[in-house]
């Protein structure tokens, strides 16, 4: 068993060997290394053909037209292009945007930028299980609402939003609907014909592809217009200039092809591992699963161990690669903004750990993890005076602490 055990698949996945093998063929003199925009010779044509194949593989996973796929450097860029691009293009119609407080920073920060430019943004409060209440969303919609951005699967708590229902609400009112699907592509079926979604962000590295490549689905019927954010040679039909990185695109295409093929197998594998881990730790007392356990991808388990500091727990679990919060914000010692939005108090939000597993995680690794978690939580609680008070039946919320 390789230590530390990797249980942070929501942060990134290792590249699948099938993907890596394919990518290597598009880099050196022996392979297809040309620029896909070079139209005057075979090196360019072959590279363009490889890009077209990958575009089809990505479109296949979501039942889209390959012409609706725009390559970007990742989901962050896709989110920026979708949110700023749509808001700017449709700003004559209105300047109101709706999103949710538990979105990824790559959605929240572009919304903050729009606010600085004079747009108004409504940040919906999720329910305590992490889901958006459709009636609250409907109530927030106005005549001047031009864009709604709600993620498919949350990166910290793994809950699945009802994208189909939200899409219906938006389509009725002719509001552009953007979805960040970085955490759901390859894990859940996505059908753009059934879901009335206009813009969808994808990332390769969350689906066993390489880092640094992503895509944005831009609906053609009804046609969605965007203002480009990256200007230059007019690549990607003017949506996103910049030489296409053939090897990364090929990697993303292959990763999405494999994901489509293995989706059910991967899902069942993750579900078995998730249940095994939860069964192994849930009797530890004062253990809370954050986010809805039913409407959730099985690849994620976010748990709070009361009376244990999350950072201390991570340091005690040195043989497990896990995170508290998401990798994008875990450098900050603030409690997770996602968990606080669910109504968790700072103590519980601070004591949370996200375990995420995937294609290469084994049962033996989960069993080892359970053993490590049990030892660490018990040891840290033994050192905590708060735990002793809790065990004595003292209601900690009533205690008056002295201020020094």
UniProtKB/Swiss-Prot annotation:
Give cofactor(s), names only: pyridoxal 5'-phosphate
Please state the Enzyme Commission number of this protein. 2.8.1.7
Any one biological process term the GO annotation gives: [2Fe-2S] cluster assembly
Q: Which reaction does it catalyse?
A: (sulfur carrier)-H + L-cysteine = (sulfur carrier)-SH + L-alanine
Residues reported to bind [2Fe-2S] cluster: 328
- Enzyme class, top EC level, equals transferase
The Swiss-Prot or TrEMBL record annotates one GO molecular function as: metal ion binding
Q: Which UniProt keywords apply?
A: 2Fe-2S, Cytoplasm, Iron, Iron-sulfur, Metal-binding, Pyridoxal phosphate, Transferase
Q: Which Pfam families match?
A: Aminotran_5
Where found? Cytoplasm
SUPFAM superfamilies named in the record = PLP-dependent transferases (SSF53383)
Q: Which GO terms describe its cellular component?
A: L-cysteine desulfurase complex
User: Where in this protein does the record say N6-(pyridoxal phosphate)lysine is found?
Assistant: 206
* Main localization category: cytoplasm
Q: Which residues cross the membrane?
A: none
The pathway where this protein functions is:
Cofactor biosynthesis; iron-sulfur cluster biosynthesis
| Residue numbers annotated as active site | 328
What this chain does, per the record?
Master enzyme that delivers sulfur to a number of partners involved in Fe-S cluster assembly, tRNA modification or cofactor biosynthesis. Catalyzes the removal of elemental sulfur atoms from cysteine to produce alanine. Functions as a sulfur delivery protein for Fe-S cluster synthesis onto IscU, an Fe-S scaffold assembly protein, as well as other S acceptor proteins.
Record text on subunit structure and interactions = Homodimer. Forms a heterotetramer with IscU, interacts with other sulfur acceptors.
Q: Which family does it belong to?
A: Belongs to the class-V pyridoxal-phosphate-dependent aminotransferase family. NifS/IscS subfamily.
Name this protein carries in UniProt: Cysteine desulfurase IscS
Cite the source lineage.
Answer: Bacteria, Pseudomonadati, Pseudomonadota, Gammaproteobacteria, Vibrionales
